[in-house]
A protein has these predicted regions:
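Extended active-site neighborhood of metal-dependent phosphoesterases/phosphodiesterases
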Residues: 53-149, 174, 178-194, 202-257
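The substrate-binding groove and active-site-proximal loops of carbohydrate-active enzymes
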Residues: 10-17, 45-51, 125-135, 167-174
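N-terminal active-site segment of His-dependent metallophosphoesterases
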Residues: 1-56
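Binuclear metal-dependent phosphoesterase catalytic core
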Residues: 212-337, 394-399
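Active-site glycine-centered loops adjacent to acidic/histidine catalytic or metal-binding residues
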Residues: 1, 46-47, 75-76, 160, ...
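Conserved acidic residues
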Residues: 40-42, 155, 193
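Conserved catalytic scaffold of divalent metal-dependent phosphoesterases
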Residues: 2-4, 92-171, 260, 269-282, ...
Length: 399
């Protein structure tokens, strides 16, 4: 969720992250209450706070409302940036939430939680820079832990930063991740590994091909649950604020996107007017409940894609920025799509996947561009600007 204090300058562009956290917790609590045929557990994939150690108290208060246990992963922003080294930086996390690497068994699966960010001082002598991968201590522990796990066991691996394929389709290597070849070889020995991560602020699922020595590994990178980092609005991959629900039945695992239903606290008023939300499919009623424009029904997990009619979505991100035109293609963003899914169809025709370097979220662009147009400033005087690319879930078909 990565919340800041409500008084933080970078938390006042649109919506307060702590407010969005409250809505997020309420949604998870209500969703969990509907699940009566199995136990419910949660996993936060890091950055449970944003460099403000006092917010651990708020986070713990939020967890108390959920009604189910939460397992936590250390993110880079969970470290105390006033500390002088990696060990001291994680002390506050450990005091409030426990160890930064551990394992446990649930059902037939073995869960492994790793700290894969090695914090170091930046040019301002603050603990905000980092190397990625495993320290010797964590690597030795991991080998010892898996020594007792049968190779037929499904492994659920969780770390803050992606440990395998990245959102830019660049494979992690020993140059970017300490002990990468070591842990890849170790996990490749198991029948199935699901590698979960956050950090990248966008959604990315990747399935290694049968020709790969990592063909047993599926990569799941999830976006920030409270939305885009600075505005706490739509996430940059084109989803509303929300989270991933993972259903486990023995060794079978499935998942879907769950949009957060609520937005109960108001706009900060830093810009006027608010974005038009021309490409959003829902609005919030007076009670802060998201309702679909098409029929007024509540926003539920049935909302798994965003469709753009012909003329709305330009062929590439660069064309869209330039304001160039229209085309006769229908575009769709299928939120958590991966290569094990079928490609979507339009009027019986299989849609073509748009290259990730060209794909973007028009819904997110409209919102971000609004704040950019109003000249909102971030740290260092940089303007808040739109972003695009690295979206792997956009398809199109000719109308």
């Amino acid at each position: 969720p990565q919340p800041r204090a409500r008084s933080a300058g970078y938390d006042n562009i649109a919506y307060h992250s702590l407010d969005m956290c409250e809505d997020f917790y309420r949604d998870m609590r209500e969703k969990a209450a509907t699940i009566t045929d199995r136990n419910v557990y949660g996993m936060m994939l890091g950055d449970v706070v944003h460099e403000n150690m006092s917010l651990y108290t708020d986070y713990l208060e939020g967890l108390k409302t959920l009604g189910f246990p939460m397992f936590n992963i250390l993110g880079n922003h969970d470290n105390d940036y006033t500390a002088s080294n990696d060990t001291d930086g994680r002390r506050k996390f450990e005091q409030h939430l426990g160890p930064t690497y551990y394992s446990f068994n649930l059902g037939r699966q073995h869960y492994v939680v790793l700290d894969n960010l090695i914090m170091k001082l930046d040019s301002n002598s603050q603990l905000r820079d980092y190397d990625q991968g495993l320290t010797e201590e964590v690597w030795q522990w991991l080998q010892n832990d898996l020594m007792y796990v049968d190779r037929s066991t499904t492994i659920m691996l969780a770390a803050h930063s992606p440990m395998f394929m990245g959102i830019n389709m660049a494979e992690r290597s020993n140059n970017t991740q300490n002990h990468r070849s070591d842990y890849a070889a170790l996990f490749s020995k198991y029948s199935k590994v699901h590698a979960w991560a956050g950090h990248a602020h966008t959604t990315f699922n990747y399935v290694y091909p049968e020709s790969s020595n990592l063909k047993n590994i599926e990569v799941h990178t999830v976006a920030r649950s409270t939305g885009e980092l600075w505005t706490n609005e739509y996430a940059i991959n084109g989803t509303p604020r929300g989270y991933t629900v993972v259903e486990v039945d023995g060794d079978d695992i499935s998942w879907y996107f769950k949009p957060t239903l609520y937005q109960r606290n108001g706009f900060t008023g830093k810009t006027s007017p608010q974005p038009e939300y021309k490409h959003r499919d829902y609005d919030f009623d007076d009670d802060g409940v998201a309702r679909l424009r098409r029929d007024g029904s509540a926003l539920t997990e049935s909302y798994q894609m965003k469709v753009y009619k012909p003329g709305q979505y330009n062929n590439t991100y660069d064309e869209m920025i330039a304001g160039n035109a229209t085309n006769k293609y229908v575009y769709v963003n299928v939120f958590l799509w991966d290569d094990k899914w079928e490609k979507p169809k339009y009027n019986g025709t299989t849609m073509t996947k748009v290259g990730y370097k060209d794909a973007y979220s028009l819904s997110a662009y409209e919102i971000n561009n609004h704040y950019y147009t109003y000249g909102y400033k971030l740290a260092g005087g940089n303007e808040y600007g739109p972003g695009g690319g690295n979206i792997h879930t956009i398809f199109r078909a000719y109308e």
